[in-house]
């Protein structure tokens, strides 16, 4: 399958958008070798369990190493050209995961472009089913910020209900749940604990409108990231599952998120608001390099402690 994007007239950019084989998607279509009805049923069940287990391990691997980098195209972004550019940038720039709107056609497009684990975001649990069938390997209840301008807020009880419903529909798929910044830090920590009990695999933080900086430059970048860094610090000490720090992060503040206790970071507007795929790749690369440098720093510190 090939993809042509009309706005990408540069030969180098068209080459960057070349389809990629996705081994996870190929594995989701098991070969049935038995002929009897019972054997076929057993084969499907066994194969499905094995695939889900191995897929979840792939999705969670970078979180366990505290180096997950998820690039987010946006909950309400159904622009195939923009999503393709963002995903290509994530793939070529060194990200470990991509996060797109929960739409089966978008998922099929992204499956053709990258072998990275694909996360779909929604606040409608029933919408996840078709997306997972299309090739998504991770689902997320979150990206509430797109609703805030209209005054729509999500309560802890509502988020817990959405989590329970999602787990009922998809008991074995990797599940990430965002804790809204509209709650106080103690309330965020409490909700995270309850989400962990309900089977969430990852907790994601957010910064929201309160992260708009009043200063420029590095000071502004630090100010913008403060709410989500504070949430990552607080929540990571309340739960045992990985925490993903998202909202308002940059190459300057990504290392701080890991230091605060996050197992990974999620970045959206710093990438998806750019209008050139090459610029997007450069931005993702700077984020990946910042994460790598933090990992090297942690290793050096561990060696120093052992030497002392």
Give the positions of each predicted feature.
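Alpha/beta enzyme core
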Residues: 2-33, 38-46, 51-245, 249-308
């Amino acid at each position: 399958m090939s993809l042509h994007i009309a706005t990408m007239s540069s030969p180098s950019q068209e080459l960057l958008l070349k389809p990629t084989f996705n081994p996870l998607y190929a594995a989701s279509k098991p070969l049935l070798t038995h002929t009897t009805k019972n054997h076929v049923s057993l084969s499907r069940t066994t194969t499905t369990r094995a695939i889900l287990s191995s897929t979840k391990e792939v999705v969670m691997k970078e979180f366990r190493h505290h180096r997950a980098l998820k690039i987010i195209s946006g909950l309400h972004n159904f622009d195939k050209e923009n999503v393709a550019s963002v995903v290509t940038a994530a793939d070529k720039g060194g990200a470990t995961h991509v996060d797109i709107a929960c739409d089966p056609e978008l998922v099929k497009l992204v499956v053709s472009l990258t072998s990275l684990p694909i996360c779909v975001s929604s606040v409608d649990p029933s919408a996840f089913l078709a997306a997972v069938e299309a090739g998504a390997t991770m689902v997320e209840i979150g990206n509430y910020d797109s609703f805030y301008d209209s005054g729509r807020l999500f309560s802890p009880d509502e988020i817990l209900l959405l989590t329970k419903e999602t787990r009922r529909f998809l008991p074995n798929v990797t599940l990430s749940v965002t804790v809204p910044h509209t709650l106080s830090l103690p309330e965020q920590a409490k909700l995270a604990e309850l989400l962990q009990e309900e089977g969430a695999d990852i907790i994601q933080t957010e910064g929201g409108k309160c992260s708009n900086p009043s200063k420029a430059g590095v000071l502004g970048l630090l100010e913008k990231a403060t709410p989500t860094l504070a949430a990552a610090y607080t929540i990571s000490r309340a739960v045992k599952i990985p925490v993903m720090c998202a909202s308002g992060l940059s190459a300057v503040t990504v290392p701080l998120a890991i230091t605060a206790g996050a197992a990974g970071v999620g970045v959206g507007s710093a990438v998806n608001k750019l209008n050139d795929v090459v610029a997007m790749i450069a931005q993702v690369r700077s984020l990946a390099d910042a994460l790598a440098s933090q990992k090297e720093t942690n290793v050096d510190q561990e060696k120093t402690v052992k030497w002392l």
